[in-house]
Amino acid sequence: MTEPIVRFQDVHKSFGDFDVLKGINLDIKPAEKVAVIGPSGSGKTTIIRMLMTLEEPSSGDIIVDGKNLWKMKKKEKMVKANEKHLREVRGDIGMVFQHFNLFPHMTILENCMTAPIHVKKENKEEVRDRSVKMLERVGLGDKLDSYPNQLSGGQKQRVAMARALVMRPKIMLFDEVTSALDPELVGEVLEVIRDLAKHEDMAMVLVTHEMDFALDIADKVLFLDEGVIAEQGTASEVIEHSENERLQGFLRRFRG
Ligand SMILES: Nc1ncnc2c1ncn2[C@@H]1O[C@H](COP(=O)(O)OP(=O)(O)OP(=O)(O)O)[C@@H](O)[C@H]1O
């Protein structure tokens, strides 16, 4: 049986007295596409931030590609070793946020090239070739020398995706990547993600409010409700056929 690329084992997360995640158990297979849906405040972004190693669990284990993220720190109190370990894991994970976080003073080609060259110390020419190919792939081959402020929101989001992909991640995380876009720009961004989902064998985790999109691309959908996974299954099982009343209420609010 294939080992999961991501495993959450009884993960809890509290901020002060507030328990945001209350025992998350989750396996994601290496090429699996997972959509996370749920009401505002249910803990979706916290799961993504934990995967990105930006938040440490209050208890439980998070294992990414066989590496137990915080174990070293807990067991050996070796903070430096743990930081190295986390850096390695981060190298395998690409993330696209709601806001694009591009570097405004760099062209879009430079935006894509900077991390592989400066963080991974890769060969500049090789990175340039890969970056050009990725920008072509997201439909921006004619904008290599443009600056972020010369692009639309949808184009900026596509640069953000290309920039993450140039790092050749094993896992891509998408946190509500269309929610800051004007409605007419949503389609072009979803189209790029759809293309990646259908043709790339990396794992993908998407927090999304686009139910039809989740139905189309997700192998698995998780319904997060008040810090627990209240329902999970295939997209059709969760979005079309679940009898969970809170999930049905949540979906009705989307469908109007
Ligand atoms: N650093 C923090 N300090 C305190 N509370 C936090 C922190 N981060 C998140 N929270 C709280 O945890 C809860 C879950 O937040 P999270 O962003 O994970 O929810 P979400 O499901 O992604 O919501 P939304 O759909 O609105 O983005 C919220 O009530 C939020 O206010």
Give the ranges of each region predicted by the language model.
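C-terminal boundary and immediately downstream tail of ABC-type ATPase nucleotide-binding domains
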Residues: S236-G256
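ABC family nucleotide-binding domain
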Residues: P4-A235
